C-alpha cells in the first residue's frame, strides 16, 4: 500500500510541476471546449500497458449507461475528449492516472466518473479505479485570468507614465526640429526667418539655434565650428549681424575670429561660464538687450586688451549714473536755444551734454531736419496715402514711383536718385544700399537699429 501511494504521489507531483511550467494552458488548448476534467487513479495486480487500460475503459463501460452516455459515441461527437493514461510498473504491479475531458453537464460528468469506478479488470490483471476529483475547467481559466492579469498590471505599473509637461515638451521639440533649416552651401543650421530677415543672430552650434527656437527667436544661424563659413561672411555684409557666443574660452575665440573676418554690428555673450544652449528665456533676453556695438568691442578687446564682461560691467555702472547727468542740463539747453543762439551755436553745447556717439548725431540731424522736413512734406503726405516709395532727383522731381518691397532692388540698379521718400522703417541694410547708390536724403516713418551712416547721407523721419 505504501508503494502504491509513493508511485501515485510521484505521478501527481510530476503533473503539478508541468502545470506550474505552463502546461496548464497548453492542456486547456488541447481540451478545447471542455467544461470538466475527470482525474482518476488506478492500480492493477500485474503488468499492463496503456492500450490495456484504454481498452478496459471503453469495453467495460459499453452499454452500461445507454446509448446517450456511450463513450465511443460521445468521443465521436466531441462531447468527451481524448482519454489520457499514464502508467508506471513497479514490483510486478502497475500504477497510473486517467484523465477524461468532458463537455457534458456536471450531472452527466459525475455519472461518467462513477462508471469508471466499476471497472475491475485491466487486461489479464485485476484492477481498481478511484476518481480523485472532477475539475471545473472554467474555474481554472478564471484563476489563470486573475493571476495573469496581476502580472500584466504589475508590468504596466512599472512602466513610467510621462507627465503632461514631458509630453508637451516632446511635441515642441519635434516642431522645433522641423522648423530648423539648412542654409547656404555649407548647410548651416538656421532658424526659418534667416533667409528673409533684416537682422540675424550668429551663434556657435546647432543646439544654440534649437534653444533660441524654443524661446521664439527664429533668425539665428550657427557657424558650426571654429572656422567661419563663407555664408556667414557674405550675410554679414547684407544684414544687421549680432554675434551671440558662449561665455567660455571657446566663445571668446570664435568672437575674435568673427570680428576679424565678418562685418559684425553687435556683440552679445552668454553669462560667464554658461553656454547659449542652456540659457533660459530670461537670460537670453537679458544678454541680447545688453549687446554692445562691435566697434566698441573691437577697440576694447584688440586695442586695450580688456574682456567683453569688463566692458559690460562698466556700461552697467555708467547706466546707473547717467540719468542724473542727462536730465538736469537738458532743460537749461532748451531754454537758452530760442533766445539768442544761432543754429551753429546750438550744436556746440549739445555735443558736450550728450557724450555718446548716437546722441552726437541727433542734434546735427535735428538742427536741419525741421526745414528739410518741410521740403519733403508734400511727398510724405503722398506716400502715407498711397503706400508707395518715391525716388526724387536733385530738383525734387519724382523720377519713379515703386512699391516699397522693390525699393532695395531698384536702388541697387539706379545711380540717378537724389532722395528717397517712403512710408516704412529705415534700417541699417537700407542705409548701406542707398549709400552705395549715391543717395543724399532718405525720408521714412522711423528708423530702427541704425548704428552707422555715411557723412554725406541725411536721414529724416516723419516725427521730426
Curated annotation (Swiss-Prot):
Spell out the reaction equation it catalyses: ssDNA + n NTP = ssDNA/pppN(pN)n-1 hybrid + (n-1) diphosphate
PROSITE patterns on file: TOPRIM
Cofactor binding mode and count: Binds two Mg(2+) per subunit.
Ligand binding (Mg(2+) 1): 204, 246
UniProt region (Disordered), positions on chain: 315-351
Q: Which of UniProt's keywords are assigned here?
A: DNA replication, DNA-directed RNA polymerase, Exosome, Magnesium, Metal-binding, Nucleotidyltransferase, Primosome, Transcription, Transferase
The enzyme's first-digit EC class, named in words, is transferase
Residues that hold Mg(2+) 2 according to the record: 246, 248
Q: Which SMART domains match?
A: TOPRIM
Query: Which residue ranges does the record assign to the Toprim domain?
Result: 198-272
Feature: compositional bias, Basic and acidic residues: 315-333
Supply the SUPFAM superfamilies for this chain: DNA primase core
Instruction: Give the domain of life.
Output: Archaea
User: Which Enzyme Commission number(s) are listed?
Assistant: 2.7.7.101
**What are the recorded Gene Ontology BP terms?**
DNA replication, synthesis of primer
What molecular functions are annotated in GO for this chain?
DNA-directed RNA polymerase activity; metal ion binding; poly(A) binding
Cofactors required:
Mg(2+)
Instruction: Identify the GO cellular component terms for this protein.
Output: cytoplasm; DNA-directed RNA polymerase complex; exosome (RNase complex); primosome complex
Q: What does this protein do?
A: RNA polymerase that catalyzes the synthesis of short RNA molecules used as primers for DNA polymerase during DNA replication. Also part of the exosome, which is a complex involved in RNA degradation. Acts as a poly(A)-binding protein that enhances the interaction between heteromeric, adenine-rich transcripts and the exosome.
Recorded family membership: Belongs to the archaeal DnaG primase family.
The record describes its quaternary structure and partners as: Forms a ternary complex with MCM helicase and DNA. Component of the archaeal exosome complex.
What's this protein's name? Answer: DNA primase DnaG
Amino acid at each position: 500500500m505504501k508503494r502504491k501511494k509513493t508511485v501515485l504521489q510521484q505521478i501527481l507531483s510530476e503533473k503539478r510541476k508541468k502545470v506550474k511550467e505552463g502546461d496548464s494552458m497548453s492542456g486547456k488548448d488541447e481540451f478545447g471546449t471542455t467544461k470538466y476534467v475527470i482525474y482518476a487513479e488506478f492500480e492493477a495486480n500485474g503488468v499492463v500497458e496503456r492500450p490495456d487500460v484504454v481498452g478496459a475503459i471503453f469495453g467495460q463501460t459499453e452499454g452500461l449507461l445507454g446509448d446517450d452516455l456511450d463513450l465511443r459515441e460521445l468521443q465521436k461527437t466531441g462531447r468527451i475528449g481524448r482519454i489520457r493514461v499514464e502508467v508506471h510498473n513497479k514490483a510486478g504491479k502497475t500504477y497510473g492516472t486517467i484523465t477524461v475531458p468532458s463537455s457534458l453537464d456536471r450531472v452527466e460528468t459525475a455519472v461518467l466518473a462513477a462508471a469508471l469506478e466499476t471497472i475491475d479488470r485491466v487486461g489479464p490483471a485485476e484492477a481498481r479505479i478511484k476518481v480523485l476529483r472532477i475539475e471545473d475547467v472554467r474555474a481554472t481559466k478564471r484563476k489563470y485570468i486573475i493571476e495573469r492579469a496581476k502580472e500584466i498590471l504589475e508590468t504596466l505599473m512599472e512602466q513610467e507614465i510621462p507627465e503632461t509637461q514631458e509630453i508637451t515638451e516632446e511635441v515642441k521639440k519635434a516642431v522645433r526640429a522641423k522648423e530648423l533649416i539648412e542654409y547656404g552651401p555649407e548647410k548651416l543650421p538656421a532658424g526659418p526667418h534667416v533667409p528673409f530677415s533684416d537682422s540675424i543672430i550668429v551663434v556657435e552650434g546647432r543646439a544654440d539655434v534649437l534653444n533660441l527656437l524654443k524661446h521664439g527667436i527664429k533668425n539665428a544661424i550657427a557657424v558650426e565650428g571654429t572656422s567661419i563659413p563663407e555664408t556667414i561672411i557674405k550675410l554679414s555684409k547684407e544684414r544687421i549681424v549680432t554675434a551671440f557666443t558662449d561665455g567660455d574660452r571657446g566663445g571668446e575665440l570664435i568672437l575674435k575670429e568673427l570680428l576679424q573676418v565678418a562685418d559684425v554690428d553687435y556683440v552679445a555673450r552668454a553669462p560667464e561660464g554658461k553656454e547659449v544652449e542652456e540659457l533660459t528665456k530670461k537670460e537670453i533676453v537679458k544678454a541680447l538687450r545688453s549687446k554692445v556695438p562691435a566697434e566698441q568691442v573691437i577697440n576694447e578687446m584688440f586695442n586695450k586688451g580688456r574682456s567683453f564682461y569688463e566692458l559690460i560691467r562698466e556700461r552697467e555702472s555708467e547706466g546707473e549714473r547717467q540719468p542724473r547727468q542727462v536730465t538736469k542740463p537738458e532743460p537749461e539747453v532748451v531754454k537758452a536755444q530760442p533766445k539768442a543762439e544761432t543754429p551753429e551755436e546750438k550744436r556746440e553745447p549739445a555735443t558736450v551734454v550728450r557724450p555718446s556717439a548716437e546722441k552726437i548725431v541727433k542734434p546735427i540731424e535735428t538742427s536741419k531736419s525741421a526745414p528739410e522736413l518741410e521740403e519733403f512734406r508734400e511727398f510724405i503726405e503722398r506716400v502715407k496715402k498711397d503706400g508707395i516709395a518715391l525716388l526724387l532727383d536733385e530738383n525734387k522731381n519724382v523720377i519713379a514711383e515703386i512699391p516699397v518691397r522693390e525699393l532695395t532692388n531698384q536702388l541697387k540698379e539706379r545711380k540717378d536718385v537724389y532722395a528717397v521718400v517712403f512710408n516704412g522703417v529705415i534700417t541699417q541694410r537700407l542705409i548701406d544700399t542707398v549709400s552705395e547708390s549715391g543717395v543724399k536724403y532718405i525720408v521714412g516713418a522711423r528708423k530702427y537699429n541704425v548704428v552707422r551712416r555715411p557723412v554725406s547721407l541725411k536721414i529724416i523721419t516723419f516725427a521730426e
